[in-house]
Amino acid sequence: MTSIVVAALYKFVTLDDYVALREPLLQTLLDNGVKGTLLLAEEGINGTVSGSREGIDALFAWLRSDPRLADIEHKESYCDEQPFYRTKVKLKKEIVTLGVPGVDPNKQVGQYVEAKDWNALISDPEVLLIDTRNDYEVAIGTFEGAVDPKTRSFREFPEYIKAHYDPARHKKVAMFCTGGIRCEKASSYMLGAGFEEVFHLKGGILKYLEEVPQEQSLWRGDCFVFDNRVTVRHDLSEGEYDQCHACRNPVSLEDRQSEHYVPGISCPHCWDSLSEKTRAGARERQKQIELARQRNQPHPLGRDPRQSTLEN
């Protein structure tokens, strides 16, 4: 099968007409057979999509025809099967939800650090290195020496910073995330909170894995991604993890040997905390998935748990 191109993209840019952009953007995706979810807000665009080489190229040609998006960048990886079930364009208040009024990367942002320069920065003992992703993402891979805030959503990040760090004592802060969007917005928040030197990894972990040879890498483990691959290895090939549809946690090969693992319904992370209502919903969803597989069709029901991660 011809490789499917998976493109992760975002750009903070003022889009006053973002509501009007939704329909032509959605039509461009549909016309070119591109699947996935894109988020539009006044502060910019964010998402991960997949399709043929021609389809992805057509999408970016359309995006870059808008002068505001002419320099939009993206990261690419490849897989043999379509990793998304649907095509969506959603309107949001924020393209990545921090929930703090006034934080605007279009006005204030930290210093971008290229992948080739990242190792030198985070090896500096005076630099505080923070992983801005969710706890279940950090659990399967992170940079050597990084702090895990143990947050379940990006909304919890500001309170974590307030509770643990002081701008007067922590002079240099470096942050990273999967594709660059969280840490870029986090850098805007940190500067507003009084931190003086704030750095973030340009292009995120995915760009680092793409550009830095594994033998020189300070990355440890797999990287969680927002599609049906669940994780990628250092060479950006698909990892060994699955994802629990009930709790969204990545599920390792070892986890899948557990008596508490029931495909699509529960895993060792959530088996003792699910309500019967949640279990019943998961059972019905899994039933529909199996029926769709038997018919060789995409799964038609329920939202993909990976899609919601874009917003958290």
Curated annotation (Swiss-Prot):
Protein source organism: Pseudomonas aeruginosa (strain ATCC 15692 / DSM 22644 / CIP 104116 / JCM 14847 / LMG 12228 / 1C / PRS 101 / PAO1)
Name of the protein: tRNA uridine(34) hydroxylase
NCBIfam families: PRK00142.1-4
Enzyme class: oxidoreductase
Family (UniProt): Belongs to the TrhO family.
InterPro entries registered for this protein in UniProt: Rhodanese-like_dom, Rhodanese-like_dom_sf, TrhO, TRHO_N
Record lineage: Bacteria, Pseudomonadati, Pseudomonadota, Gammaproteobacteria, Pseudomonadales
Catalytic site positions: 177
GO biological process: tRNA modification
Keyword Oxidoreductase: yes
Pfam families: Rhodanese, UPF0176_N
Residues of the Rhodanese domain: 123-217
